[in-house]
Regions:
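Short, charged, surface-exposed secondary-structure boundary motifs
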Residues: 36-38, 53-56, 101-107, 155, ...
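Preference for protein termini
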Residues: 1-31, 65-66, 179, 204-206, ...
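Conserved hydrophobic "DFG−1" position in protein kinase catalytic cores
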Residues: 160, 189, 200, 266-268
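ATP-dependent carboxylate activation and anion-phosphoryl transfer catalytic cores
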Residues: 65, 219, 239-351
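ATP-binding N-terminal substructure of ATP-dependent carboxylate-amine bond-forming enzymes
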Residues: 1-95, 130
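ATP-dependent carboxylate/phosphate-activation module, predominantly the ATP-grasp catalytic core
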Residues: 165, 169-175, 182, 188-195, ...
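Active-site nucleotide/adenylate-binding loops and adjacent lid/helix of ATP-dependent enzymes
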Residues: 100-185, 192, 204, 244-245
Length: 351
C-alpha cells in the first residue's frame, strides 16, 4: 500500500484490519518522516514516483514480500499504474486508463456525463481572462458561480464568486503566484444543496457494493476562501437511493466493463437533484472509515477479496447504514459513533 503514514493510508489500514485482520500489510512511501508513522506490518522507503528508479524499487519490494495486491492511494499513483507497459509481479484492481484519464479531468468528466444524461452542474472551460465575462453571461441564471481548477484534489483553487471580476482576479493570482494558467480553470453553476460522498465497488461492469454519507461540516473549511473542502469534519451515513442511481449511471456512461473502486462527490442543485462534481477513480476516500466501519459490509475489505478473485455474494448491494456519525480532526483517530452513543460520558452543563 502506497502513502504509508498519511491519514488516508492509515485510515485504510484501520479499515482493512477491522474487516480482514489476517492480512499482512506492507507500506511504502518516498518520505521517510511520513513512513515512520505507518501502521503497516512492514515499511519500505521508495524513490519519488517521478524518479526513474521508482518502479524498479517497487518491483523489488513486491517480489521480496511476495505481495498479492498493490493498492495506490493518490491520483498520481493511479495514473502512473494504469499506463501501458507497467508490468508488476502482483495484482492491480484499477479501472482502465481511458476511464482514469476522463475522471482525472473534471471538465472532461462533466462533458462526458452530461452527454449521457447524468446530472452534472452546468460547466464551461476558461479559455483566457478575457473570456470570463462571456462565460458569466452564460451562467446569468445563477446567483453564484463556482470557480475551480479542473485537475487535482482537496478543492485546490476552488472558490465561489458572484462577479466576473472576482473570478478574473482569483485566476490571475493563481497564474502569477502558482503558475497555474487560466486555461486550467472552469466556471460552473454553484450547487447550493446537500453534499454527499459515495464509494462504490465494481467488477467487469457489475456493481457489487455501494455506500453513502453526507458531509455536514468541513475540515479546515473556515480557513478556505470557499468555506468548504473535500474533507469532512463531521459526516453522517445516509440512505439516498437517488445518489446511488446517479453514481451507477455515471459509471455505466464511462465504461460498460468497469472494475475497481470509485469515490464520488455530489451536491444537490437548486431543484434538489444530486449532481456529480467529481469522481476520484481507482482509490479510496481519505475518510474511508465511514464506509468500512459501519453497516453490514466493510467496503475496503470487500475490495481486497474481489481484487484477489475471491467470491463475494453481493450484487448491486446498497449498504445504507443510517445512524452513524464520523468526526475527524488533526492528529486524532477518526471517531465513528452511533447516534445513541453521541452523548455517552458527556454531562450537559449549559444551564
Amino acid at each position: 500500500m502506497t502513502g504509508a503514514g498519511t491519514a488516508a493510508t492509515s485510515n485504510l489500514i484501520r479499515s482493512l484490519r477491522a474487516g480482514a485482520d489476517s492480512l499482512f500489510i506492507v507500506g511504502a512511501h518516498s518520505d521517510r518522516f511520513f513512513l515512520r508513522k505507518s501502521s503497516a506490518d512492514a515499511n519500505y522507503l521508495l524513490p519519488d514516483l517521478t524518479h526513474p528508479r521508482f518502479f524498479p524499487a517497487l518491483r523489488r519490494v513486491l517480489a521480496k514480500e511476495r505481495i498479492d495486491l498493490l493498492i495506490p492511494t493518490t491520483d498520481a499513483e493511479v495514473r502512473a499504474l494504469v499506463r501501458p507497459g507497467r508490468r508488476l509481479p502482483c495484482r492491480l484492481f484499477l479501472p482502465r486508463k481511458a476511464v482514469v484519464d476522463v475522471c482525472q479531468d473534471k471538465y472532461r468528466l462533466n462533458v462526458r456525463l452530461r452527454s449521457r444524461g447524468v446530472p452534472v452542474p452546468a460547466t464551461y472551460p476558461v479559455s483566457g481572462l478575457g473570456a470570463i465575462d462571456k462565460t458569466f453571461r452564460r451562467l446569468a441564471d445563477h446567483e453564484r458561480v463556482w470557480c475551480r481548477i479542473r485537475v487535482g484534489s482537496g478543492s485546490m483553487g476552488a472558490i465561489p464568486v458572484k462577479r466576473a471580476e472576482q473570478a478574473r482576479s482569483w485566476i490571475a493570482y493563481w497564474d502569477e503566484m502558482r503558475g497555474v494558467p487560466a486555461t486550467s480553470f472552469t466556471l460552473s453553476e454553484f450547487l447550493p444543496g446537500r453534499d454527499f460522498s459515495c464509494q462504490a465497488l465494481w467488477k467487469a461492469g457489475e456493481l457489487i457494493l455501494t455506500k453513502t454519507c453526507e458531509r455536514l461540516s468541513y475540515f479546515g473549511g473556515g480557513s478556505q476562501p470557499s468555506g468548504i473542502s473535500s474533507v469532512s469534519q463531521l459526516a453522517k451515513t445516509v440512505r439516498e437511493p437517488r445518489v446511488v442511481e446517479v453514481c451507477a449511471a455515471a459509471i455505466r456512461a464511462l465504461d460498460r466493463r468497469a472494475s475497481g473502486t470509485f469515490n464520488f462527490d455530489l451536491r444537490e442543485n437548486a431543484r434538489g437533484v444530486p449532481c456529480i462534481t467529481e469522481i476520484n477513480v481507482g482509490r479510496f476516500a481519505s475518510g474511508t472509515n465511514v464506509f468500512d466501519l459501519t453497516g453490514q459490509h466493510n467496503l475496503a475489505a470487500t475490495f481486497v477479496r474481489v481484487a484477489l478473485g475471491r467470491r463475494v455474494d453481493l450484487h448491486e448491494e446498497y449498504d445504507a447504514a443510517e445512524g452513524y456519525y464520523t468526526v475527524r480532526d488533526l492528529d486524532t483517530l477518526t471517531g465513528v459513533f452511533r447516534t445513541d452513543e453521541l452523548f455517552d460520558r458527556i454531562v450537559d452543563a449549559r444551564e
